[in-house]
UniProtKB/Swiss-Prot annotation:
CDD domains documented for this protein: embe-CoV_Protein-I_like
Function field: Structural protein that is not essential for the viral replication either in tissue culture or in its natural host.
Keyword ATP-binding: no
Organism, scientific name: Human coronavirus HKU1 (isolate N1)
Protein name: Protein I
Keywords on record: Virion
Amino acid sequence: MLEVEAPLEIVQESSRKLLGLTNLSEITKPLIEAEKPNLNSLCLLNHKEILSHIIPGSPGSLNFKKVETLNFQMVKEFPLLSEYPLLKQKDIGIDTAGVLLKQLMVNKSSCYRDGISTISVPAHMPMHPMVNPSKGSSGLLITKLTLLLPPMFRQGILLLKKLSLLGFRLVRFCLKAIMLKAQEGLLLIVDQVHVLNHVDPIIVH
């Protein structure tokens, strides 16, 4: 027997009739639908099924209170992603000079009509009268000295009475130390008065 090859169109017609299809697009339609998932069907998926794939463990061990809160967050956040395109999110940090100028011009109280920005200063500043610090400080120093010297002399006299009972040499040594300390204190006071009043130095003998 001679084998005769049938044309390709006849073979396709016969295969479509056997499968019950009348158009070639009906054969490829299921394949295209399988390759391109429907977004609406993905959105309509049950959130419990999605979380069962994301969260490890069996679906029966899930805490349904957490599932409900997560579902609320997904419902609240998902529409926002579709409203803002990705281009607006990429514009962060490009050039903010225009935004800063707009913010400056909004504050009309600190800008003239020509656009020059000014610093707002309070109209009435509290003005204190000029006081000479040297006179005030020197007067305070004198009053302090007049208040401190009498009790110091009293303590020195009592100390001399106590030292006189111990011996002459010890009294002499203590008096010498006291005089040196007093001379040092007087020199420090003279330096302070000279700095404050700008007078000639006082020579202490």
